[in-house]
From Swiss-Prot:
Keywords: NADP, Oxidoreductase. It is an enzyme of class 1 (oxidoreductase). One of its GO terms (molecular function) is GMP reductase activity. The keyword Oxidoreductase applies. GO terms for biological process: purine nucleotide metabolic process. The active site is at residue 176. It comes from Streptococcus gordonii (strain Challis / ATCC 35105 / BCRC 15272 / CH1 / DL1 / V288). NADP(+) binds at residues 205-228. Its EC number is 1.7.1.7. GO terms for cellular component: cytosol; GMP reductase complex. Catalyzes the irreversible NADPH-dependent deamination of GMP to IMP. It functions in the conversion of nucleobase, nucleoside and nucleotide derivatives of G to A nucleotides, and in maintaining the intracellular balance of A and G nucleotides. It catalyses: IMP + NH4(+) + NADP(+) = GMP + NADPH + 2 H(+). This is GMP reductase.
């Protein structure tokens, strides 16, 4: 089935420049329409406890950025939706697939969030399909994102069940060790998986995991993503919820995966790890730099907006793009 399938990842690809048509990169438009709303960038911070909390979500929403609140403060989700709506901001939350989540979804009818993400490690499952159908029945106006998946069959099934977008990526992230613990996943070929899935997708795809540089955002869009979910690049900021730790005078912040023992509590099956990242500056500085770099990407693509990135040529260079630079 996969004999003539090209396998590559972000560091194996270089996009090929086209004639520039803008006077300055500032003319390039990085906005993306996703569901009924338009956002400043096609990126979304990972819905993980060390990346996003209520205050980060509010800052992102006020700034015109997409966000997805994590699902690990279950009791806080309904009040969160109410608070965001009272502030005139969009509400975007996550749910799992356990039985009690069905009642929770039904309880949102009076104040439905604009976006719900069904967030489990292996999203190609009957339990996810059932939950998509339940949300669509109870909250027909809510935009449903479902994942995570790694195959065209999964994308087709979730779309057919009613998902408005699918999240592609099984374990390619920096703090995800699914590939090591289970032998399964898209680690090492995430960009190929994205391309493979996008060929059958009729609805938007969120590329989730494996992003290490701002240039990887442009590459994700080239291979079919409408939105790019990023963990490690958004971790460790002053505003980030992770705990700050000082070692020999240097400050670090904790960052761990959604399926880690720190996330789940002890004695549960674990597919994530905890790492310390050097503490960064403000979140807005990273968002601004991402926007400027993406504007440069658009100018190299020979266009004025994100769509131009979908048409550029590319070469497969097998890890040589670093030219001896440290990873």
């Amino acid at each position: 089935m996969l004999n003539d399938f090209q396998v590559f990842d972000y560091e194996d690809i270089q996009l090929i420049p086209a004639k520039c048509v803008v006077k300055s990169r500032a003319e390039a438009d990085t906005r993306v329409k996703f569901g009924n709303h338009t956002f400043r960038l096609p990126v979304v911070p990972s819905n993980m406890q060390t990346i996003i909390d209520e205050s980060v979500a509010e800052e992102l929403a006020r700034g015109g950025y997409f966000y997805i609140m994590h699902r690990f403060d279950e009791e806080g989700r309904k009040p969160f939706v109410k608070q965001m709506h009272e502030k005139g901001l969009i509400a975007s939350i996550s749910v799992g697939v356990k039985d009690y989540e069905y009642d929770f979804v039904s309880s949102l009818k009076e104040d439905a969030p604009e976006y719900i993400t069904i967030d489990i490690a292996h999203g190609h499952s009957d339990s996810v399909i059932k939950m998509i159908q339940h949300i669509k029945k109870e909250l027909p106006e809510t935009f449903v994102i479902a994942g995570n998946v790694g195959t065209p069959e999964a994308v087709r099934e979730l779309e057919n069940a009613g998902a408005d977008a699918t999240k592609v990526g099984i374990g390619p992230g920096k703090v995800c060790i699914t590939k090591v613990k289970t032998g399964f996943g898209t680690g090492g070929w995430q960009l190929s998986a994205l391309r493979w899935c996008s060929k059958v997708a009729r609805k938007p795809i969120i590329a989730d995991g494996g992003i290490r540089t701002h240039g990887d955002i442009a590459k994700s869009i080239r291979f079919g993503a409408s939105m790019v979910m990023i963990g490690s690049l958004f971790a460790g900021h002053i505003e980030s919820p992770g705990e700050t730790i000082e070692i020999d005078g240097d400050k670090f912040k904790e960052y761990y995966g959604s399926a880690s023992e720190y996330q789940k509590g002890a004695y549960k099956n674990v597919e994530g790890k905890k790492i310390l990242l050097p503490a960064k500056g403000h979140l807005q500085d990273t968002l601004t730099e991402m926007e400027q770099d993406l504007q440069s990407s658009i100018s190299y693509a020979g266009g004025r907006d994100l769509h131009s990135l979908t048409r550029v040529d590319y070469v497969i260079v097998k890890n040589s793009i670093w030219n001896g630079d440290a990873h």
